[in-house]
A protein has these predicted regions:
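Short beta-strand-centered aromatic/proline hotspots
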Residues: 18-26
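Acidic, low-complexity, intrinsically disordered interaction modules
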Residues: 25-141
Length: 149
């Protein structure tokens, strides 16, 4: 079995993996797992990264996995951020401003015990966003969030 590469920055991940991906926090590896959603490695984790920058994002929660968390009181992988990897950075580790035409930025959180959706700080459920930064401190920020309802 070949070891998966580890990346520090989103542009390293995008250059190596590219395309549509599904990302989730990997507690055991203290990083994000990046799963390919197209190409020959579709459905496989192809990299681990300390930060990820995504465009055209959808927030996905598998309700069956969430119910298992609630019943067993034990974590499992059931919530994901789907999007396209981006490389638009300023070379100093900061996102160029403006990368997109952003009207609103919110912090995004997910807690299976609070509700079945990713939410902003006001507990408004989110379906997706124009862009998302998943940073090395495991905080997530969405530009132009798309609220449910």
């Amino acid at each position: 079995m070949t070891a998966k590469p580890r990346y520090e920055t989103s542009e390293q991940v995008a250059a190596a993996v590219g395309g549509r991906v599904r990302v989730y926090r990997n507690l055991a590896r203290d990083s994000y797992s990046v799963m390919a959603m197209e190409g020959p490695n579709k459905g496989r984790v192809v990299a681990w990264a300390k930060e990820v920058l995504l465009d055209d994002v959808k927030f996905v929660v598998r309700e069956s996995g969430r119910q298992r968390v609630l019943n067993e009181r034990r974590k499992n992988v059931h919530a994901f951020v789907d999007g396209t990897l981006l490389m638009d950075r300023d070379g100093k580790g900061s996102v160029k401003q403006p990368v997109w035409d952003i009207d609103e930025t919110v912090r995004v959180r997910y807690n299976p015990y609070v509700g079945p959706h990713f939410m902003d700080d006001c507990h408004q459920p989110l379906a997706g966003a124009g862009c998302v930064l998943m940073d090395s401190d495991f905080k997530m920020y969405a530009g132009n969030p798309q609220r449910l309802g």
